[in-house]
Design a protein with these regions (language model features):
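Generic structural signal for well-ordered alpha-helical scaffold segments
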Residues: 12-20, 43, 47, 80-84, ...
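Short glycine-rich anion-binding loops that position phosphate/pyrophosphate groups of nucleotides
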Residues: 33-34, 64, 128-133, 139
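A glycine- and small-aliphatic-rich helix-loop capping segment at beta-alpha/alpha-beta transitions
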Residues: 41-52, 75-77, 139-148
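Ligand-binding beta-strand-loop-alpha-helix segment within the catalytic cores
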Residues: 51-123
Length: 182
């Protein structure tokens, strides 16, 4: 891609083709700065009548542990603000890991089951973090893992503190993430 706008448009083209070819597809979605332009393009095409999200299911890549869906730093909030509130997707078919579940193993197991019940992910949108992380999976992480908890590295905390009032507000020590499409 020539630049961010071109990359965003190309990614949106791939996603829209998936939705058109399989209206009841399962999209794996990402958060952060990488996909924002893609979501803006998808919203624009939806508003023009070119896309219909009514049968789409989504599963998000990750979530901070300890943040409620209403917290403006949660990835559920991010997805609502940057995509779901602007298209005709059925929010009961949009899934983000449960950041409020106290039992991390239970939260991971439940999210894995949600993904399995959807039949896996048809298309996964990913973004790359400043150090090459995908989701909260740092470089060198095993890609065959299902949903699991990870400790945020200091470099990821440093990069993500810009989204919070202070570095101390960045949720620790773990966050939920998955890469495997089941």
């Amino acid at each position: 891609a020539k630049d961010y706008q071109d990359m965003s448009r190309k990614a949106a083209n791939i996603i829209s083709a998936q939705i058109i070819m399989k209206p009841n597809c399962v999209l794996g979605l990402a958060t952060g700065s990488s996909p924002v332009g893609t979501y803006k393009q998808l919203i624009e095409w939806y508003k023009k009548g070119d896309l219909d999200f009514s049968q789409v299911t989504s599963v998000n890549l990750d979530e901070y542990k300890g943040l409620s869906p209403e917290n403006d730093q949660s990835y559920r909030y991010f997805m609502n603000t940057n995509l779901f509130d602007h298209v005709n997707i059925d929010k009961t078919r949009t899934f983000v890991p449960n950041g409020l579940e106290a039992d991390s193993d239970k939260a991971c197991s439940e999210y894995n089951e949600i993904i399995r019940k959807q039949g896996g992910v048809d298309l996964q949108l990913l973004g790359l973090g400043h150090n090459g992380h995908i989701g909260f999976n740092e470089p060198g992480a095993a890609f065959e893992k299902e949903t699991h908890c990870v400790d945020l590295t200091e470099s990821t905390i440093e990069a993500n503190k810009r989204f919070f009032e202070s570095e101390d507000d960045v949720p620790r020590p773990v966050s939920y993430t998955h890469l495997r499409a089941h």
